[in-house]
Amino acid sequence: MQEAGIDEFAAGGGHVEPAAEVDPAAALKAELRSKPGDWYVIHSYAGYENKVKANLETRVQNLDVGDCIFQVEVPTEEVTEIKNGQRRLVNRKVLPGYILVRMDLTDDSWAAVRNTPGVTGFVGATSRPSALALDDVVKFLLPSGSAKKDAKGAVSTAAAAEAGGLERSIIEVDYEVGESVTVMDGPFATLPATISEVNAEQQKLKVLVSIFGRETPVELTFSQVSKI
């Protein structure tokens, strides 16, 4: 009977149904839910996020609090940047000035984080910080994976255009410094923002978005915002 089953499978061309596509956000959320601890946001100085991450990871080892501080992340996304006419892929921080920490909140873990050089405090109540919702954690951590595909596509399109295979489109700059816009894409979608800088060559804007009650500069493309 087993041989007959194999013959029938071969006769049918050995067709196997393709696996269903997995939603990256749902998969990441399930993975995060299975891990211990809650996610908290700590504030630092913009530009020092990676240094603070390294400082905290060193303190976790030195203070032997690895049983309550499990993971430290500086969320990044891969984007295409145009500089001097050349396109290149760069890692950009999703939350400038902020670091995510997965931990069990205890007196020891709180003190280890709060007294780390470069940390200016937890986001939330001073005595008892609030954990970040899992959906928000997914929103901040997921762009690093999804942005890579977009960035690669942008590079391919640029190469094709330079080879004459595509006609470069001209995008009219219709944004001004001080103008209010709505973020349409990415982790800050639906939030209002104020334009602080316009880069016509790279087709990007620097906007101020209120993140955790504080105005934070975020870099976005023209297509990621909409006029109010």
From Swiss-Prot:
Keywords carried by this UniProt record: Transcription, Transcription antitermination, Transcription regulation, Transcription termination
GO biological process: DNA-templated transcription termination; regulation of DNA-templated transcription elongation; transcription antitermination; transcription elongation-coupled chromatin remodeling
GO CC list: cytosol
Domain of life: Bacteria
The keyword Transcription regulation is annotated on this UniProt entry: yes
InterPro entries named in the record: NGN, NGN-like_dom, NGN_dom_sf, NusG-like, Rib_uL2_dom2, Transcrpt_antiterm_NusG, Transcrpt_antiterm_NusG_bac_CS, Translation_prot_SH3-like_sf
Residues in coiled coil: none
One Pfam family per UniProt: NusG
CDD domains named in the record: KOW_NusG (cd06091), NGN_Bact_1 (cd09891)
Similarity-based family: Belongs to the NusG family.
Function (record text): Participates in transcription elongation, termination and antitermination.
Protein name: Transcription termination/antitermination protein NusG
